[in-house]
């Protein structure tokens, strides 16, 4: 058995994107847009097939009417709350909205039932349309690769990402959530890929093979400087930095039919094991403010880790609560003491016994993210003021041409994106008008604020995610079994929004703190670390444990009282912390002897 792993290498921040790479990103973007167009046309044709059946068409008419009623009532409720400056409004109006949503839900189910009746009859027509979609997608390969310059591995990567997005959207629709594919403009970001082909029985594509300048894959991917991981662990940090600075050579499509390569100055932080079988690599280019960043992701197959069979059982329950030190995102408990590193004890809190505690996202991260939001707010206000100035100037003067056409004040009044005004500032920079100086002064300041905003946000989120990875590493190094609850943060958030009576500003502040803490990210890091290190992971249903008192076993009612902490148990009358009770029950269920 083997496991897939991805090693990421950062590309030097001063590296300039070559024109051949920019062209490949542009082709990959156009391919993705064509795939979206084909999929949207397929969805429309599939809907037309269902609508051709009278019963389904009638159900769709009913659903459309119910949806229109629900939207209209939602707007009335929204307006009533604005006028009342409170969540508490007419009970009759809110009941009408609930009834409208219930009718819409029933109408959607009626359509699904009508489709189920004619599903077999429409099978041939659906299959024919699916075959046509597959043929259209296949034809794009000839357009972009055989007759164009896009590298075939990049084509496969874009197509795989597209199919993954289609499956995700189908799953969201099946759960009743609105979702659809959208077109995007090209901003210079994207992904290109290479794949290392190997015939059955051929030697593995090991790091040593890729480090060989005369190796089999030298014209696809060459990663020099490989160091055995055991030797790497014995090197100092300075030695690792120096040894890890290598230049990767990677295939990058073609220009007029001629193969092209690019050189990537990367920093390696860890090396793959000697027996790893490297299957390919992706160069991911992202845009941070107005600057491009790149990273190289190398994918490989490695042998499975030996499963862990000894160690304490650790239970982890997600949530979010405000504390003096930050936002508590989880409660944990172990059946044996855990050794928490000194540097993490302010984040992974532990009691005197060393068997339980909470995980807290430091308040400094919240303050840093709040600062970036304040910068974004300042930029938005400055943009509004600039828009008014440009509109006023255009109303009183004859405007210079913009993109070979006169620019109207009514057009600029509709602009919302800062990029539009930045483009206008560049276009009118040297025309000698008063408005050009105003535009350029705004652009010069906004560019700096945008960089501060995005870099500050990126660093704060990176700090949070790194803390989560460190916590996951601490648990995986010591635990023999990990229990994680299946609490859905999104569902809890939506439920809280529906029932809250707090002012909108207060609720938005709570939502921002929850989003900044991202409890789900901690669970993802823990599960990934356990899977990598061979530690068994069990997902525990949170449905009953959240309301059960661990001391007396009483299951309390599911009402709003139990959103606060602590609460009083209706069974024994004692006050208790429901989060600590939850992890206690998780451990008790895991260690209880199974019935024969």
Curated annotation (Swiss-Prot):
Q: Region (Recognition domain (REC2)): which ranges? A: 54-121
Q: Where does Mg(2+) bind?
A: 317, 579
Q: Where is this region: RuvC-II?
A: 578-596
Q: Where is this region: Recognition domain (REC1-C)?
A: 122-190
> Outcome of mutating residue 156 to A, per the record?
Less than 10% of target DNA-binding in vitro
Q: How is it used?
A: Has been repurposed to perform C-to-T base editing by fusion with a cytidine deaminase and a uracil glycolase inhibitor. The small size of this protein may facilitate its delivery by adeno-associated viruses.
Family (UniProt): Belongs to the CRISPR-associated DNA-binding protein Cas12m family.
From the record, give the cysteines joined by S-S bonds.
none
How would you summarize the oligomeric state and partners of this protein? Binds crRNA and target dsDNA as a monomer.
Give the free-text miscellaneous remark of the entry. Answer: Part of a type V-M CRISPR-Cas system.
**How many cofactors are bound and how?**
Binds only 1 Mg(2+) as opposed to 2 usually seen in other Cas12 enzymes; lack of the second Mg(2+) results in loss of target DNA cleavage activity. Binds 1 Zn(2+) within the target nucleic-acid binding (TNB) domain.
Q: Which domain of life is it from?
A: Bacteria
Presence of the UniProt keyword NADP in the record: no
Recorded protein name is CRISPR-associated DNA-binding protein Cas12m
Impact reported for residue 485 to A: Loss of plasmid silencing in vivo, no change in pre-crRNA processing in vitro, decreased target DNA-binding in vitro, in vivo no change in silencing when crRNA targets a reporter gene promoter, strong disruption of silencing when cRNA targets downstream of reporter genes
Q: Which residues does the annotated region (RuvC-I) include?
A: 314-541
Example GO molecular function:
RNA binding
Changing residue 111 to A has the effect of:
Less than 10% of target DNA-binding in vitro, in vivo no change in silencing when crRNA targets a reporter gene promoter, strong disruption of silencing when cRNA targets downstream of reporter genes
Q: Which UniProt keywords apply?
A: Antiviral defense, Coiled coil, DNA-binding, Metal-binding, RNA-binding, Transcription, Transcription regulation, Zinc
Cofactor (UniProt): Mg(2+); Zn(2+)
């Amino acid at each position: 058995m083997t496991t897939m792993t991805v090693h990421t290498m950062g590309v030097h921040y001063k590296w300039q994107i070559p024109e051949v790479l920019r062209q490949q990103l542009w082709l990959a973007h156009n391919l993705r847009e064509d795939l979206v167009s084909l999929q949207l046309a397929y969805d429309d044709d599939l809907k037309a097939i269902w609508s051709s059946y009278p019963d389904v068409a009638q159900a769709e008419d009913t659903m459309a009417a119910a949806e229109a009623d629900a939207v209209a009532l939602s707007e009335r409720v929204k307006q009533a709350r604005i006028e009342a400056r409170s969540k508490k409004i007419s009970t009759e109006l809110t009941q009408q909205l609930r009834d409208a949503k219930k009718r819409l839900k029933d109408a959607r189910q009626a359509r699904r039932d009508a489709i189920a009746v004619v599903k077999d009859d429409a099978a041939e027509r659906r299959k024919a349309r699916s075959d046509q979609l597959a043929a259209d997608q296949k034809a794009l390969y000839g357009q972009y690769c055989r007759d164009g310059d896009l590298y075939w591995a990049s084509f496969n990567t874009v197509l795989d990402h597209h199919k993954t997005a289609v499956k995700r959207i189908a799953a969201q629709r099946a759960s009743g959530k609105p979702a659809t594919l959208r077109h995007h403009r090209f901003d210079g970001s994207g992904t290109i890929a290479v794949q290392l082909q190997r015939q059955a029985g051929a030697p593995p594509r090991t790091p040593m093979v890729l480090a060989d300048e005369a190796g089999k894959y030298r014209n696809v991917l060459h990663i020099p400087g490989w160091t055995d991981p055991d030797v790497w662990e014995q090197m100092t940090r300075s030695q690792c930095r120096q040894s890890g600075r290598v230049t990767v050579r990677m295939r990058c499509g073609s220009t007029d039919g001629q193969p092209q390569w690019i050189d990537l100055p990367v920093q390696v932080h860890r090396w793959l094991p000697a027996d790893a079988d490297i299957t390919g690599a992706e160069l991911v280019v992202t845009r941070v403010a107005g600057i491009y960043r790149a990273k190289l992701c190398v994918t490989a197959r490695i042998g499975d880790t030996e499963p862990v069979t000894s160690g304490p059982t650790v239970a982890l329950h997600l949530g979010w609560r405000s504390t003096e030190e930050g936002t508590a995102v989880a409660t944990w408990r172990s059946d044996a003491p855990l050794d928490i590193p000194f540097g993490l004890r302010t984040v992974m809190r532990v009691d005197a016994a060393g068997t339980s505690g909470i995980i807290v996202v430091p308040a400094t991260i919240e303050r840093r993210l709040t600062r970036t939001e304040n910068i974004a707010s300042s930029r938005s206000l400055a943009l509004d003021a600039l828009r008014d100035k440009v509109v006023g100037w255009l109303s009183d003067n004859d405007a210079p041409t913009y993109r070979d056409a006169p620019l109207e004040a009514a057009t600029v009044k509709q602009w919302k994106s800062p990029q539009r005004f930045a483009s206008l500032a560049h276009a009118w920079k040297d025309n000698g008008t008063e408005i050009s100086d105003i535009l350029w002064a705004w652009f010069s300041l906004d560019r700096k604020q945008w960089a501060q905003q995005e870099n500050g946000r990126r660093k704060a989120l990176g700090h949070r995610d790194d803390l989560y990875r460190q916590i996951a590493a601490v648990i995986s190094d010591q635990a023999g079994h990990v229990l994680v609850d299946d609490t859905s943060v999104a569902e809890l958030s939506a439920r809280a929004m529906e029932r809250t009576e707090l002012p909108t500003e207060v609720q938005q502040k709570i939502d921002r703190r929850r989003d900044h803490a991202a409890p789900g990210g901690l669970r993802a890091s823990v599960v990934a670390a356990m899977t990598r290190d061979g530690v068994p992971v069990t997902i525990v249903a949170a449905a009953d444990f959240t309301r059960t008192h661990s001391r007396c076993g009483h299951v309390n009612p599911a009402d709003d009282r139990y959103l606060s902490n602590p609460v009083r148990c209706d069974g024994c009358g004692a006050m208790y912390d429901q989060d600590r009770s939850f992890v206690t029950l998780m451990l008790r269920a895991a260690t209880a002897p199974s019935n024969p």
